[in-house]
Amino acid sequence: MATVKWADASEPQRGRQGRIPYSLYSPLLVDSEQPWKVIPRNLVPINKKDKNKLIGYWNVQKRFRTRKGKRVDLSPKLHFYYLGTGPHKDAKFRERVEGVVWVAVDGAKTEPTGYGVRRKNSEPEIPHFNQKLPNGVTVVEEPDSRAPSRSQSRSQSRGRGESKPQSRNPSSDRNHNSQDDIMKAVAAALKSLGFDKPQEKDKKSAKTGTPKPSRNQSPASSQTSAKSLARSQSSETKEQKHEMQKPRWKRQPNDDVTSNVTQCFGPRDLDHNFGSAGVVANGVKAKGYPQFAELVPSTAAMLFDSHIVSKESGNTVVLTFTTRVTVPKDHPHLGKFLEELNAFTREMQQHPLLNPSALEFNPSQTSPATAEPVRDEVSIETDIIDEVN
């Protein structure tokens, strides 16, 4: 017969010294590494009415969890036993025992109470006290994991075995519903961050993958599939074009001509001096974009490590963020990042300084325009890292 070892004893009681008796009450959870300094010396459950027997001890259960191969200590649990019961039933009151906190009310007799311990199949009682629990001490009110008997476990196992054939379809329905709930939660999270709702095409591909054409597929069904593919591609194009409808500070330029870096943020100049021709053409899909992004401040850094200035401009408010990033010289991505600074000024770079979607300029077909007055150019010194319009 297998031996079951419960974990509600102190460290010296672990191992092969027998099963630990069950406490009559639910344990206390103490948020301290030294519970004997927190528990009052008269903290005895008053569920029993005989004041002469309100005496006993709290047995400390040390707990820990392993995280990444390292032991992490958790808050200990304390289980109460009346004097003369429990794992230290032979110990005298106030005898020095490791992991034991002796408690008693005034007038209690220092002799065995005879109350015994909890039976295996019974539930623990919620302990009641005549005083308020100290800060950091709470009663664990969830059912004890050791309470269910072996017969109850067998009956539950038989019940699960008998209901297994009937639960196949509901289980698949639950899995399907859980997948839908996950997709809805992801879509809501993306929408709150400024992204658009994922397309149905993405949902179907995530669930079923890319369907393969059947041998018996009719030409009509093939045409239908081609139309569906064209519609999905058209929806992707609309999705990319939709970048221009977002606020300037929410755009994600990509490799599409209608929503690249130049369309979203204008051509490269002294105020927009990051990106070579290849990076500007591909935006967030550029080859080195993930490495570049590692050197860009996070949202929290922009909020809490920046100098933020607000200025009204008509019906809008301009927020100016000024921040700095200190990067070690041996950072693996710093070299590539620096190569992208002021890359548009190099002769080998061919940046589209003009709007690629603008009409071709033809002076012969245009009417003579009125000459605008010449105004003196005003030099403005800027120290703007990021603007939110």
Swiss-Prot record:
It comes from the Viruses. It is found in: Virion; Host endoplasmic reticulum-Golgi intermediate compartment; Host Golgi apparatus. ADP-ribosylated. The ADP-ribosylation is retained in the virion during infection. Phosphorylated on serine and threonine residues. Coiled coil: none annotated. Residues 20-141 form the CoV N NTD domain. Residues 207-235 have a biased composition (Polar residues). Residues 379-389 have a biased composition (Acidic residues). GO terms for molecular function: identical protein binding; RNA binding. Pfam families: CoV_nucleocap. The keyword Transcription applies. Residues 146-158 have a biased composition (Low complexity). GO terms for cellular component: host cell endoplasmic reticulum-Golgi intermediate compartment; host cell Golgi apparatus; ribonucleoprotein complex; viral nucleocapsid. Keywords: ADP-ribosylation, Host Golgi apparatus, Phosphoprotein, Ribonucleoprotein, RNA-binding, Transcription, Transcription regulation, Viral nucleoprotein, Virion. Residues 111-178, 194-264, 363-389 are annotated as: Disordered. Residues 243-347 are annotated as: Dimerization. CDD domains: CoV_N-CTD (cd21595), CoV_N-NTD (cd21554). Residues 236-352 form the CoV N CTD domain. Belongs to the alphacoronavirus nucleocapsid protein family. Packages the positive strand viral genome RNA into a helical ribonucleocapsid (RNP) and plays a fundamental role during virion assembly through its interactions with the viral genome and membrane protein M. Plays an important role in enhancing the efficiency of subgenomic viral RNA transcription as well as viral replication. This is Nucleoprotein. The gene is N.
